[in-house]
């Protein structure tokens, strides 16, 4: 029987640089990494179910996009104690309506109307959209990368059409948040959380380019709430690694505009302009190692 410290499932080609960094970090600390990809998925699944392979910690970055990985995820849920983003919690975090209901209780979120799925309720009662302003955003409960999202919506007819695109999903109608300007930048941030550490970044919502918030900027603009809010979201969602988007309005409110993103895009900025700053990705691998090391089995040395 082979025992690994960490099992990582991944299927996105652009994860390769992150996986390389993680693998090098594991090797430097004497830790073993089992990578399960589409190429070795069948063989690995058989080896796991036959108890030829076991692992201490499980990290899934594939099953959200490829259902073929679900058997490995299910096995890990039943047999592995330690997870980076436990699947049950990740599934809840993927549901934007569920996250809105949890987060909006204690933190600022955009004014939001939630709708049942089209399959559940094809005909909607009369909805007053005036509270959302002149235009609003229509979002399905699941999905990322803008799939199914309608920006600058203005009419109920757009809502009725949009909710039929993904008829099994609930929908959110959200008022637009206009960020304040801080110096030369708009006060819109994407903040990454990993195992207790928070990485605040300026976020250009048009170009999707990250810029790490410097300590001087954080102090000068009083941005400490980005850390406390993100840590509070981590407590509510229970995930080890995720990102969130927060905007500061002209009246100084910190508003969570995109609740929980998982799995997060970990492309290196040196390889892709809209990737994550390299130093953050490298630090994330070190944070993950700190989770793995206490569960390392000495017999592997």
Give the positions of each predicted feature.
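C-terminal active-site "lid" helix and adjoining low-complexity regulatory extension at the edge
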Residues: 248-301
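Short acidic/polar capping segments at secondary-structure boundaries
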Residues: 88-90, 117-120, 141-145, 155-157, ...
């Amino acid at each position: 029987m082979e025992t690994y410290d960490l099992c990582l499932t991944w299927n996105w080609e652009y994860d390769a640089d992150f996986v390389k960094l993680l693998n090098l970090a594991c090797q430097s600390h004497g830790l073993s990494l089992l990578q399960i990809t589409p190429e070795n998925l069948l063989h690995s699944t058989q080896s796991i179910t036959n108890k030829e392979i076991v692992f201490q910690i499980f990290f899934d970055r594939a099953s959200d996009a490829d259902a073929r990985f679900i058997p490995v995820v299910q096995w890990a849920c039943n047999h592995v104690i330690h997870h980076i983003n436990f699947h049950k919690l990740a599934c809840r975090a993927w549901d934007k309506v569920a996250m809105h209901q949890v987060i909006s209780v204690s933190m600022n979120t955009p004014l939001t109307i939630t709708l049942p799925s089209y399959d559940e309720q094809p005909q909607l009662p009369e909805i007053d959209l005036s509270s959302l302003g002149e235009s609003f955003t229509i979002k399905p409960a699941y999905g990322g990368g803008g799939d199914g999202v309608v920006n600058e919506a203005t009419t109920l007819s757009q809502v009725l059409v949009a909710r039929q695109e993904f008829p099994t999903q609930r929908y959110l109608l959200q008022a637009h948040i206009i960020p304040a300007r801080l110096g030369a930048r708009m006060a819109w941030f994407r903040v990454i959380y990993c195992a207790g550490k928070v990485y605040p970044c300026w976020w250009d919502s048009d170009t999707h380019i990250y810029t790490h918030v410097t300590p001087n900027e954080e102090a000068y603009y009083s941005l400490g709430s980005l850390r406390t809010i993100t840590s509070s979201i981590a407590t509510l969602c229970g995930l080890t690694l995720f990102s969130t988007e927060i905007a500061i309005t002209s009246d100084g409110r910190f508003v969570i505009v995109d609740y929980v993103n998982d799995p997060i895009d970990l492309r290196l900025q040196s390889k892709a302009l809209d990737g994550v700053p390299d130093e953050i990705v490298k630090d994330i691998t070190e944070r993950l190692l700190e989770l793995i090391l206490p569960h390392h089995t000495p017999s592997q040395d």
